[in-house]
């Protein structure tokens, strides 16, 4: 891995609360505390193993595909020039080499399907080079942004709340031990491996207790029900069947076969050998300009042919299901909306994003 320069990506300042500044390492270690890093670490090790396997196979990288992926990234982040990209990377402790290596590694993941054997390495015991490669992947994949948001929400909750009760902190300590699968006597060793101390752990427990206290107050049954009414249409679940066709004429012909001849969608697809599949989604998942088409069509009816890529899709609505709080996905989305709205406002008062390299 190429050097990231004089500033490690671990040391970039990502947010501040009061006079205290927090680094990328703080956000990552907080994710370790919450038990949210392990899956990302395992995925990263798989990516590294795929890259190593590609080297063993002497796989020729598709530079065009890698370049397209990098350009799409720059477009999403509004990085028009090379100078803007370099500044964006430098502010995060990264270089163009890190940038290029990341997209080459992602290509290897998609190109190598067999013979990939990730190493069994714990995050806390990995060497610095591997860890900094991991941080680069967290930054470029957007995963670090999510960790920063989760940290700032908790910092804001801590600042806005009274000192958590000892019972609440004790409850978080029990959850922490359960998440890690360790005994109280093993905590000191765990902290040493992470490079933290008991003061840090106590602060994490207090922050989490304050955050959970806010969440419990916010996610009362009445609040969920009010939010459900506001999101009734967007959280309507659609079950559809669709056929993929090569042209508008073919789509219109298939439409007539269903409407006029009484054939099923699957029969039309089988007869003409068109791809056929079922799909489920919430209305809010569709682009805004596509939503009215689905709202205006009754259950059991077909939509007019829809352009999709180089061809068209013919879609029939099998079922429309109104949202209910008993649906775990609906409930999760409602709770996430409530949390995002509340903590977005709270963080403007107490915690502030501050992405920069330390001076």
Residue locations for each model-derived region?
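Peptidyl-prolyl cis-trans isomerase
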Residues: 1-12, 20-359
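Short aromatic-centered micro-motifs
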Residues: 15
């Amino acid at each position: 891995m190429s050097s990231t320069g004089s500033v490690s990506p671990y040391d970039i300042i990502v947010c501040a609360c009061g006079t205290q500044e927090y680094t990328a390492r703080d956000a990552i270690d907080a994710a370790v505390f919450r038990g949210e890093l392990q899956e990302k670490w395992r995925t990263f090790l798989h990516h590294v193993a795929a890259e190593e396997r590609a080297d063993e196979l002497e796989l020729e990288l598709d530079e065009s595909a890698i370049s397209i992926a990098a350009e799409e990234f720059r477009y999403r982040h509004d990085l028009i020039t090379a100078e803007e990209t370099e500044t964006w990377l430098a502010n995060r402790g990264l270089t163009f080499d890190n940038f290029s290596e990341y997209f080459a590694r992602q290509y290897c993941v998609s190109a190598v399907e067999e013979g990939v054997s990730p190493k069994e390495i714990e995050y806390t015991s990995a060497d610095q080079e591997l860890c900094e490669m991991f941080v680069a992947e967290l930054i470029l994949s957007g995963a670090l942004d999510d960790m920063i948001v989760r940290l700032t929400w908790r910092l804001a909750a801590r600042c806005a709340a009274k000192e958590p009760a000892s019972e609440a902190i004790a409850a978080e300590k029990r959850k922490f031990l359960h998440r890690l699968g360790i005994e109280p006597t093993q905590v000191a060793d765990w902290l040493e491996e992470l490079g933290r101390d008991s003061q840090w752990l106590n602060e994490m427990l207090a922050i989490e207790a304050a955050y959970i206290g806010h969440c419990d107050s916010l996610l009362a049954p009445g609040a969920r029900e009010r939010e459900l009414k506001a999101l009734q249409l967007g959280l309507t679940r659609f079950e559809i069947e669709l056929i993929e066709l090569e042209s508008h004429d073919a789509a219109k012909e298939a439409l007539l076969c269903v409407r006029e001849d009484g054939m099923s969608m699957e029969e039309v697809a089988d007869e003409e050998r068109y791809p056929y599949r079922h799909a489920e989604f919430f209305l809010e998942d569709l682009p805004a300009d596509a939503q009215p088409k689905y709202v205006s069509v009754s259950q059991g009816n077909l939509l007019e042919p829809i352009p999709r890529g180089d061809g068209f899709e013919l879609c029939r609505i099998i079922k429309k299901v109104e949202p209910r709080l008993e649906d775990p996905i609906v409930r999760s989305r409602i709770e996430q909306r409530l949390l995002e709205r509340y903590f977005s406002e709270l963080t403007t008062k107490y915690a502030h994003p501050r992405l920069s390299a330390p001076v």
